[in-house]
């Protein structure tokens, strides 16, 4: 969708984002993804934007057939499964239909054919995937939103799952590309969020290197100890000297972080976590 948006809002808006790596590799991916989705949607703050990583094909099908998703969200990868072929999992982004609308629907509402609330919604501009240099065929799922305060520009939402394990040099290249996407001509800024696989000290330097804002650091300061924002290995027994890590992040450019919290996974069958990752919930001002 590349039509020019209409009826842009000029006032500042607050949006909420939830990001969660739902772990495709463990058993029962559909059951676990449904529990995570239920937890997200039953939370005290209904999210405007949902970033999901490690979505297996079966979990994708379950999400797309979920009545709440169908009635309440605009969803990427709904029309075909191209991005899920030849890979064990991919990313998906869900946008609240209360806060976001397509250009066509926005035009209809402006003309009085809708419910007359088109002006309260931000308008979807385009969706694409940017291939990244990756050992695992990872990409960045990009959703462009018509920027409320900058006519003709877009607000860019990047859902990412960076390379794993010892691929730090690839993660550095990936972050260079992602930071560049937020600084492209016509982009007023945006969000990079998801599983950064930040397991080494050098990984945590990449946000500052590219002059981006790490929402957790900006709002909480501490990145160590029980309140340090760890999202992996939390509340479980770890072996081989491993410690909980802040693998998942929300970083931004040109936006104001307001709140960020870690969402703990529950258990399925009293012993299996919904995911080996916690989720992140962040609110920010555009």
What is the predicted function of each stretch?
Residues 28-36, 55, 86, 135-138, ...:
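Soluble or luminal CAZymes and related metallo-dependent hydrolases
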Residues 29, 49-154, 162:
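Structured beta-strand-rich core segments of catalytic domains in phosphoester-bond hydrolases
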Residues 1-7, 183-191, 197-286:
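Metal-dependent phosphoester-hydrolase catalytic domains
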Residues 16-22, 36-64, 143, 156-160, ...:
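Active-site beta-strand/loop signature of hydrolases that rely on acidic residues for catalysis
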Residues 25-29, 223-226:
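Short, solvent-exposed loop/turn elements at domain surfaces
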């Amino acid at each position: 969708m590349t039509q020019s948006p209409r009826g842009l809002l000029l006032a500042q808006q607050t949006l909420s984002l939830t990001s969660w790596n739902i772990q495709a590799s463990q058993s029962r991916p559909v059951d676990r993804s449904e529990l995570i989705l239920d937890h997200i949607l039953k939370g005290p703050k209904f999210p405007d934007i949902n970033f999901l990583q490690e979505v297996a094909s079966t979990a994708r099908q379950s999400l797309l057939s979920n009545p709440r998703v169908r009635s309440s969200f605009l969803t990427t990868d709904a029309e075909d499964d191209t991005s899920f072929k030849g890979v064990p999992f991919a990313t998906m982004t869900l946008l609240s239909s209360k806060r976001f609308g397509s250009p066509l629907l926005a035009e209809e509402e402006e003309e009085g054919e809708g419910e007359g609330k088109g002006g309260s919604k931000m308008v979807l501009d385009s969706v694409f995937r940017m291939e990244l240099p990756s050992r695992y065929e990872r990409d960045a799922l990009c959703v462009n939103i018509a920027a409320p305060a900058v006519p003709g520009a877009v607000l860019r939402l990047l859902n990412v799952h960076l390379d794993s394990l010892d691929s730090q040099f690839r993660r550095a290249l990936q972050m260079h590309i992602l930071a560049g996407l937020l600084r492209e001509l016509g982009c007023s800024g945006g969000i990079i969020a998801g599983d950064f696989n930040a397991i080494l000290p050098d990984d945590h330097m990449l946000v500052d290197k590219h002059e981006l804002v790490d929402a957790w650091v900006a709002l909480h300061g501490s990145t160590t100890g029980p309140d340090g924002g760890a999202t992996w290995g939390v509340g479980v027994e770890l072996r081989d000297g491993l410690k909980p890590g802040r693998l998942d992040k929300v970083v931004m450019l040109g936006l104001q972080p307001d709140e960020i919290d870690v969402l703990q996974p529950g258990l399925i069958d009293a012993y299996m976590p919904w995911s080996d990752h916690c989720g992140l919930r962040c609110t920010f001002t555009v």
